[in-house]
Amino acid sequence: LKKLFTDRLALMSDSAQVHGDVVRIAIGPKTMYLVNHPDLAKHVLADNAANYHKGIGLQEARRALGDGLLTSDGETWKKQRRTIQPVFQPKRIARQASVVANEVEGLVKRLRDTTGPVEILHEMTGLTLGVLGKTLLDADLAGFTSLGHSFEAVQDQAMFEAVTLSMVPQWAPLKKQLRFRESRDDLRRIAEELVEQRFANPAENGEDVLSRLIDSSGTREQMRDELITLLLAGHETTASTLGWAFHLLDEHPDIAEKLRAEADAVLGDQLPTHEDLHRLPYTARVIEEVMRLYPPVWLLPRVAQADDEIGGYHIPAGSDVVVVPYTLHRHPAFWPEPEKFDPDRFDPDRFDPDRPSGRPRYAYIPFGAGPRFCIGNSLGVMEAVFVLTMVLRDFELRKLPGYDVVPEAMLSLRVRGGLPMTVHTRNRR
């Protein structure tokens, strides 16, 4: 029980290793089932998805996020998804490539002018929020400096609720609950301000999320909730993935050099375009491997609506069922040397004699799976590719000597306490 509060990742990993693909954990009067096998994950997330609604943690996050796309279920979720789906159409995302590249170029210029260590997670949070604002909202978020801190408090509280299975009353005078309420109010204020700005200044083409929300004729509260959800989900996962990427590439300079060589050969001194994505396969494999080891969505909590059976276990209605991508992505039956950072395991030309037909589809689900597959995955991957190629072709980023990088399991998987790194300009020949 102590590990639920002190080291959730170790609890998940140890439980999977000792108890197998379904782990039953009793917490007071409540029971949680951890799911750690691709076939069982497919059952929960796709085949029988209608029986599994959003679960612990995300239910509690609703207190801050409202009924946005991340927390809603049923017909409400379907309507919300239909409303904003056009914003994420492949052709529209492709048209945003120049916007993303220009935002990353601004980051490169800031890094070039830096003296001393840079807190890289802070930089990635600012960058991803900036990209989100320009590409999806047609808005400038630079003035809303409290966004990152407020979202961190919301994640902290949601995860606290998850590991206690919501048994701590909301009125309990805990410092984290006070911080949560202050952050919730801050997020609502920012979202309401952005909505009012769009009402006052309609966008010319009306293709952005704010315009779509206004056209949907929802209430101001519904628009606010959708916007808060988008702001969180749209920046946090990409920022966390990039933080882990810079950490792992610092640990594996040979892989960083291969990525640089590809960037030099494909891009030269030019900004990347959407058409360049298929010409940067090694960079894409690096990002895939980063997300295998540190999936941005590291657990997928659900609540069973009716009795079910998973892996031989009877699952009573009302049970908390958690699919755990963090352990799925390290399952030794599907991932040889699962702790090794090896981007080439995603090379389509690499043949594995133990798995001639390839690994199961649900052995790798960094963006979730089934009907609730992450709507913004293509934008996030494009952004990550652009950041790694543009930053690494100009710089080497190195962690401070002796700095201990520890995962922190929030709604996403973050580096605890940030990631300070020194920036060294690369001698490009």
Identify the residue ranges that each predicted region occupies.
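N-terminal membrane-proximal hinge/A-helix region immediately C-terminal to the signal-anchor transmembrane segment
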Residues: 1-79, 94-106, 127, 139-142, ...
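Conserved cytochrome P450 K-helix E-x-x-R motif and the immediately C-terminal K′/meander segment
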Residues: 2-20, 189, 193, 269-311, ...
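Conserved cytochrome P450 K-helix/beta-meander segment immediately N-terminal to the heme-binding cysteine loop
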Residues: 50, 323-358
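Cytochrome P450 heme-binding "Cys pocket" and the immediately downstream C-terminal segment
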Residues: 253-255, 379-413
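Short, small-residue alpha-helix embedded
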Residues: 237-250, 387
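Cytochrome P450 heme-thiolate monooxygenase catalytic core
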Residues: 9, 53-60, 76-78, 92-240, ...
